[in-house]
Amino acid sequence: MNHGGNSTMRHCSMKMTFNTDYDNLCIVFKSWHIGNLSQFLLSLLAIAILGYLFERLRSFTSLKETEFQRGYAGQQSEGLLTHHSKSLKSGRPFRLCALYAVQLVFSYFLMLVAMTYNAYVILAIAIGAAFGYRRSHCDTVQTVGLCH
């Protein structure tokens, strides 16, 4: 067994303080191992896209919740809850719960990405989320989530 210092194996570098290093950075998985600047820049782009998609998902979920609440309130106030409309509405709460679960998993994944403590990675999340927020909420006010 050779334990010499000339090994070509690269190991993930896990820093527990804020940093700007990218050499040997692993993001969430060992297979997402960054060894050079071009890989780092591509990863930042991918992370920004993830931030963007997360905000778009949040907007879509919010829209579907609002549509459901308006539709349910309208039917309830008019007394039009027939057996047919009840059966159509019964799948909606499940779909809303599923959307929420996807959003929750997505937000935790972004949190794990941010836990690299790399300033550029965190900035990429923020930039992507900001673009997604801007694209989704041009004229509306939305509360900001805390897990991203």
UniProtKB/Swiss-Prot annotation:
InterPro entries: Cop_transporter. It is a multi-pass membrane protein. Induction: By copper deprivation. It comes from the Eukaryota. One of its GO terms (biological process) is copper ion export from vacuole. GO terms for cellular component: fungal-type vacuole membrane; plasma membrane; prospore membrane. Coiled coil: none annotated. Signal peptide: none annotated. GO terms for molecular function: copper ion transmembrane transporter activity. The keyword Protease does not apply. Its main location: membrane. Keywords: Copper, Copper transport, Ion transport, Membrane, Transmembrane, Transmembrane helix, Transport, Vacuole. The keyword Membrane applies. Mobilizes stored copper from the vacuole to the cytoplasm under conditions of copper limitation. Belongs to the copper transporter (Ctr) (TC 1.A.56) family. SLC31A subfamily. This is Copper transport protein ctr6. It comes from Schizosaccharomyces pombe (strain 972 / ATCC 24843). The gene is ctr6.
